[in-house]
Amino acid sequence: NGTQSNAYRLSQKGGLNVITLPKTIDNDVAMTDICFGFDTAKSIATEAIDRLHTTATSHHRIIALELMGHSAGWLALGAGIAGGADVILIPEIHYDIHAIAEFLNNRRQSGKRFSIIAVAEGATAVGSVPDSGEEASGGKKTGKKKAEKKADPKIVTSGSQQEPVMIREPMVNRIVRELQALTGVEARMTQLGHVQRGGTPTSTDRLLCTRL
């Protein structure tokens, strides 16, 4: 988002002729079919889901993997489908935790003793408030209280003077905690973090960059 926005500002206010390339693992640059970097990140995330199947199966757990994607769910969606995730949560569609719990319980009753959930970091529950300072529709927050916050705020101390600092718990932590309570099944979470942003590019990304 920042690269394309700043390029636009330079062209409009700086009087410069600017050419930008669609580079982002989120694959969310408007008017493009695919952004380079996306396929590489998707491959890394897919491999992570493949590996999580082993421990989820052997320990009969629910495992949620948080992937990048604050406002776009392409990465979680693509990796989730390719890796065989049982549930995929993306920012574009608010999730219902009770519906998810019911689905997971039905899986166990049918003999499936584990479940994998791919979660985009920007996924939110029904009735939650985006934390970007804007409503989901793109407008400014009205200041009205909503039924649910995006994440649970906690107070911690930091620095030599022990000043209070407000931090927010990742939504994936809350998802795992609620699902464990609703299903009675041990649930764990893992965050792939910046691992998905690096590494050797896939052949698809190399070809795309060469063509560009």
Task: Identify the meaning behind each predicted range.
Residues 31-42, 199-206:
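Short beta-strand elements at the ligand-binding edges of bilobed clamshell
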Residues 7-9, 14, 38-59, 63-185:
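Accessory alpha-helical/coil subdomains and C-terminal extensions
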Residues 17:
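Gly/Ser-rich helix-loop-strand patches that form or flank binding pockets
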Residues 22, 33, 65, 69, ...:
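Short glycine- and Lys/Arg-enriched binding-loop motifs that mark or flank ligand-binding interfaces
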Residues 1-3, 21-28, 92-95, 121-124, ...:
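Short, ordered loop/turn segments at secondary-structure junctions
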